[in-house]
């Protein structure tokens, strides 16, 4: 199989304009004839559903939450990037494009990233028009702050609740279309399979999480906006319900999964406090704008009160190692540096798994009131969880799984290799390479939903006149039968181990062998352990209740079953990519000073994996990465 990214043959800065000028259009009268299914109601899903419905399409939107407002986009804290250059500090579309390419360690598709930078400027205007209360300077102008991997201030924010405010704006547009009857919303409904007819995506199989009823829905195109798969690690900053099921079930129907091993470990999270935990809490990257990260220089000082350790005995390791960026070095680099300090025995807090994030200098320079205005809700959240006052004592933080750069493979149209299956936001792979810069996830989700898919979808739909199918087609009946059997198979195991015990064990395997540091030996061992654990899962799973009605045990079991297959694919991808790049750090490939050592000669490609059936090894298909505008170079933030 040869992958065609369908990139326009124009100069980089003209590609998107050229594409839009030549894109095929669906007339208003014909838009009413097309039905679309959108799975997911976060920023990508809600913005796509509202925009496409406004254009005249009939839209069905599905989410497993009880309301679209509870999509995980609501948890994003720090901000959203846009190349507005309001600070007059040298920012531009090109600089945002280059920072994103460089931040991803030259493992993302150039054309998609440039388009993202171009449309970023429209997002802020759209959200401002929806009433999103972005922070403002004293004079009333929109404010910006700095995020990792950038030397300009381009991040717009709404205190520490940016994701919440952006999602409420998108939800307002979605609600308007629901009220008009243009969007039919299906909350508490989980996608369990993708239905193909003649090789095209024509619908989905879903389970009503309240009644347990399994039904089928047909459409002319399917859009997956289902987020990332960080919960394969069990402990992550993701909401408990976040999962890989929708994208992985599409993968098992033939959609290629790209770069699954590219996962992001966020440097500023509240450390694990005990085995009882089921998730971790993010402390926004925006805190690194004013906070300074340090550990004691001497191991014997780690148990002391931080205020008693003199300045001369503190190691501000990011400022020392990366003077040009300091505490705003990219996430992958910052996380590895924190781990390195803790591995040396200089970590603080229980188990030595923590570093300090200190605001004493910022409070002295700006005053506590200013810090409260910028980060007050984050400081309150930290105190509620830890019982410590971060105005008086440094926060303790440690890296944790946060975001996934991998996802289903898509071309320039955001369409997967399955015709009619489009993938938006974190669910696709296209924009962030091997490491995402802070404040760029919200940017991608809204860019895809508001400003990309409304232009690209017509290129597919114009080929589908007269090809409508309904849910009575034999393909739907077969998929419905298979899904029902899969659910019943889980219930019929009747073993002794609860589902969470399998998930926790899988997460530990993934963290130990496919986390911040990876090796060929460790990944090989991880694959063997996952295969053994999966076999035990299918023979010893204990579920409470049946298939009818609300059964959260059954919901989790289906998701963990997918994680147990997907985790092996992640490890296989990490094993096959015999280099270090971004968040993928192979210990065999590092520079003398411990930085990631890329191998552009052999690995400058997208790893797209094809499912080959249960028990068979997936097939690797490569999409070469072609750089017209930038020349891949050694990534340096020093």
Predicted segments — roles?
Residues 32-34, 212-221, 417:
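Core beta-strand elements of the Rossmann-like FAD/NAD(P) dinucleotide-binding domain
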Residues 54-76:
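Glycine-rich FAD pyrophosphate-binding loop
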Residues 459-550:
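Long, amphipathic alpha-helical stalk/connector segments used for oligomerization, subunit docking
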Residues 221-280, 435-455:
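Glycine-rich loop(s) and the adjacent beta-strand/alpha-helix scaffold that form part
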Residues 36-61:
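N-terminal Rossmann-like FAD-binding beta1-loop-alpha1 element of flavoenzymes
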Residues 1-36, 54, 634-635:
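Extreme N-terminal leader/targeting segments of oxidoreductases
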Residues 249, 256-384, 455-459:
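An anion/pyrophosphate-binding glycine-rich loop and adjacent beta-alpha core
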Residues 123-213, 225, 269-280, 288:
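Conserved redox-cofactor binding core of oxidoreductases
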């Amino acid at each position: 199989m040869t992958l065609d990214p369908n990139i326009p043959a124009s100069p980089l800065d003209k590609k998107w304009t050229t594409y839009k000028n030549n894109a095929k259009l669906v007339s208003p009268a014909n838009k009413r004839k097309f039905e679309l299914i959108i799975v997911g109601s976060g920023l990508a899903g809600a913005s796509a559903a509202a925009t496409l419905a406004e254009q005249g399409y009939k839209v069905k939107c599905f989410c497993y939450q009880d309301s679209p407002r509870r999509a995980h986009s609501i948890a994003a804290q720090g901000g959203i990037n846009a190349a507005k250059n309001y600070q007059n500090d040298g920012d531009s579309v090109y600089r945002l494009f280059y920072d994103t390419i460089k931040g991803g360690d030259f493992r993302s598709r150039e054309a998609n990233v440039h388009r993202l930078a171009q449309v970023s400027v429209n997002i802020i205007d759209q959200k401002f028009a929806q009433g999103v209360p972005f922070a403002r300077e004293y004079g009333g102008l929109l404010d910006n702050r700095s995020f990792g991997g950038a030397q300009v201030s381009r991040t717009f924010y709404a205190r520490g609740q940016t994701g919440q405010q952006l999602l409420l704006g998108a939800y307002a547009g979605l609600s308007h279309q629901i009220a008009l009857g243009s969007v039919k919303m299906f909350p508490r409904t989980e996608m369990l399979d993708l239905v193909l007819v003649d090789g095209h995506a024509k619908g989905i199989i879903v389970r009503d999480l309240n009644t347990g009823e399994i039904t089928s829905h047909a459409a002319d195109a399917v859009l997956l906006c289902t987020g990332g798969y960080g919960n394969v690690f069990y402990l992550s900053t993701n909401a408990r319900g976040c999962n890989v099921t929708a994208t992985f079930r599409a993968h098992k129907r033939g959609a290629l999964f790209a770069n699954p091993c590219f996962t992001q470990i966020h440097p500023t999270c509240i450390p694990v406090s005990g085995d009882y935990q089921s998730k971790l809490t993010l402390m926004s990257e925006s805190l690194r704008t004013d906070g300074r990260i340090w550990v004691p220089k001497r191991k014997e000082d780690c148990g002391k009160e931080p205020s008693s350790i003199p300045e001369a005995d503190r190691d501000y390791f990011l400022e020392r190692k990366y003077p040009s960026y300091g505490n705003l070095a990219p996430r992958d680099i910052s996380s590895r540096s924190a781990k390195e300090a803790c591995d040396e025995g200089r970590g603080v807090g229980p188990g030595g798994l923590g570093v300090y994030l200190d605001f004493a200098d910022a409070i002295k320079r700006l005053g506590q009131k200013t810090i409260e205005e910028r980060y007050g809700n984050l400081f309150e959240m930290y105190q509620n969880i830890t019982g410590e006052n971060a105005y008086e004592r440094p926060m303790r933080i440690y890296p944790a799984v946060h975001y996934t750069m991998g996802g289903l493979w898509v071309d320039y149209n955001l369409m997967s290799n399955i015709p009619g299956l489009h993938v938006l936001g974190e669910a696709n792979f296209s924009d962030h390479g091997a490491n995402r810069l802070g404040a760029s996830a919200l940017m991608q989700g809204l860019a895809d939903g508001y400003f990309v898919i409304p232009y690209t979808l017509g290129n597919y739909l114009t080929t589908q006149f007269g090809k409508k199918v309904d849910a009575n087609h034999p393909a739907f009946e077969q998929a419905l039968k298979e899904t029902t059997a899969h659910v019943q198979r889980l219930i019929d195991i009747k073993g002794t181990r609860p589902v969470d015990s399998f998930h926790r064990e899988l997460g530990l395997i993934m963290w130990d062998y496919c986390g911040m540091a990876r090796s060929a030996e460790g990944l090989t061992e991880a694959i063997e352990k996952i295969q053994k654990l999966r076999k035990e899962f299918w023979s010893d799973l204990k579920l409470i209740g049946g298939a009818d009605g609300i059964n959260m045990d059954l919901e989790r079991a289906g998701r963990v079953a997918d994680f147990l297959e997907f985790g092996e694919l992640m490890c296989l991808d990490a094993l096959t990519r015999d280099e270090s790049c971004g968040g993928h750090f192979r210990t065999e490939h590092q520079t003398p000073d411990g930085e990631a050592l890329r191998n552009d000669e052999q690995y400058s490609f997208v790893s797209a994996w094809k499912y080959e059936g249960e028990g068979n090894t997936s097939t690797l298909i490569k999409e070469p990465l072609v750089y017209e505008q930038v020349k891949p170079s050694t990534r340096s933030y020093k």
